UniProtKB/Swiss-Prot annotation:
Organism this protein belongs to: Citrobacter koseri (strain ATCC BAA-895 / CDC 4225-83 / SGSC4696)
Protein name as annotated: Putative glutamate--cysteine ligase 2
Range of residues in the leader sequence: none
Family membership: Belongs to the glutamate--cysteine ligase type 2 family. YbdK subfamily.
EC number: 6.3.2.2
Record's keyword terms, sorted: ATP-binding, Ligase, Nucleotide-binding
Length: 372
């Protein structure tokens, strides 16, 4: 199946997807009963969408097309109230975080969905292990060539996005020593990491055609790239972030990505080339392992920069664009986060260090998401 034509969308519009954890109190393990909850929510929504993800312990909530983060926040807030009430009716609770800290992957049931069942057949237990929870942000583009330029531009800041959203230090009952352990789950997938090099939309079409030769790829949705074009939406989709613990933080991260996209496509500050990616996975690893305390290596000069310092530079560079797209509040909030050394992975570890249990940690995350 060829890659569809790139759908023209309004530049810099955005959509946000959040993969949420559905848990069973009082033990706070992952539930296997998301289907009745999702069915109960769907008919009550006035905007956005709630749907299944890979396994029965996941619920995906997604905005519609939004012009700015205020619209996205309003949609999410309305959806959240419906989800919370339906969850209470089903004796379930909801929380964010990139991983559940003590669930066992062997217990996870893949949704009864043709695409997910086909993926299970292709990848086996890896799909059950992929019961992890991420935030995806779509940015509208006018054409396919702009999308490819934007994809390469945003790829330079993948470590920054990972570090700002890092919220998965625990997995399978253990401290992983990573700030974001979630992305490690995908390391065994053959399409993990950045999109293979393509300099324009025509080359991307050729790349996709060759990938379909494997008989494992039917659509762009079958590819697990960190950032991928979504021609049916007319967007570029950033997929590297853990699901934050609060809707406010999720919206702020989306605002940064929207502002960065505006800066990249308006200023065109880079001439992208394939060798830009030579140290991509090393810098990505630093962000996953150490968060904002990681070290970035410049592939062209060999210079080292603290990820926190480089993130502050990014926030400064995109400030004017943030004003243009209505995301100034997001930039200000994230700047404060970086300067104060705040991150959700650290807060999780501090809770446990202070005597909290992993069960108590999930309970706390549910309270945070509910605004308690």
């Amino acid at each position: 199946m060829p890659l569809p034509d790139f759908h023209v969308s309004e530049p810099f519009t955005l959509g946000i997807e959040l993969e949420m954890q559905v848990v069973n109190p009082p033990g706070y393990d992952l539930s296997q009963d998301s289907s009745p909850l999702i069915d109960a929510v769907k008919s009550q929504l006035t905007a956005g969408e709630v749907k299944h993800d890979i396994t029965e312990s996941m619920l995906e909530m997604a905005t519609g097309v939004c012009r700015n983060i205020d619209q996205a926040a309003a949609q999410f807030s309305a959806m959240q109230q419906v989800i919370l009430q339906a969850a209470a009716d089903h004796h379930l609770e909801i929380c964010g975080g990139g991983t559940h800290p003590f669930q066992k992957w062997q217990r996870q049931e893949v949704c009864d969905n043709a695409r997910y069942q086909r993926t299970l057949e292709n990848f086996g237990y890896l799909i059950q292990q992929a019961t992890v929870f991420g935030q995806h942000v779509h940015i509208g583009c006018a054409n396919g060539d702009d999308a490819i330029y934007l994809l390469h531009g945003l790829s330079r800041f993948v470590p920054h996005f990972i570090a700002l959203a890092a919220a998965s230090p625990y997995m399978q009952g253990s401290d992983t020593r990573f700030s974001s352990a979630r992305l490690n789950i995908f390391s065994s997938f053959p399409d993990n990491g950045p999109m293979p090099w393509a300099s324009n939309w025509q080359e991307c079409e050729g790349l996709f055609r060759r990938l379909t030769y494997t008989s494992m790829i039917d659509s762009i949705k079958d590819l697990h790239w960190d950032i991928r074009p979504s021609p049916h939406f007319g967007t570029v989709e950033v997929r590297v972030m853990d699901t934050p613990l609060t809707l406010a933080h999720a919206v702020n991260i989306a605002g940064l990505i929207q502002a960065t996209a505006h800066w990249l496509l308006t200023e065109r500050p880079f001439r992208h080339q394939e060798r830009d990616y030579l140290l991509y996975k090393f810098n990505r690893f630093q962000a996953c392992r150490y968060g904002l305390e990681g070290t970035l290596t410049d592939v062209h000069t060999g210079n080292h920069h603290l990820l926190s310092d480089d993130t502050l530079r990014l926030l400064e560079n995109v400030a004017s664009s943030a004003d243009n797209v209505g995301a100034a509040s997001a930039i200000n909030a994230l700047r404060l986060q970086v300067k104060n050394g705040l991150n959700e992975a650290r807060q999780m570890r501090e809770f446990v260090t202070d005597g909290g249990s992993l069960i108590g940690l999930v309970k706390k995350h549910c309270e945070i998401w509910a605004g308690q």
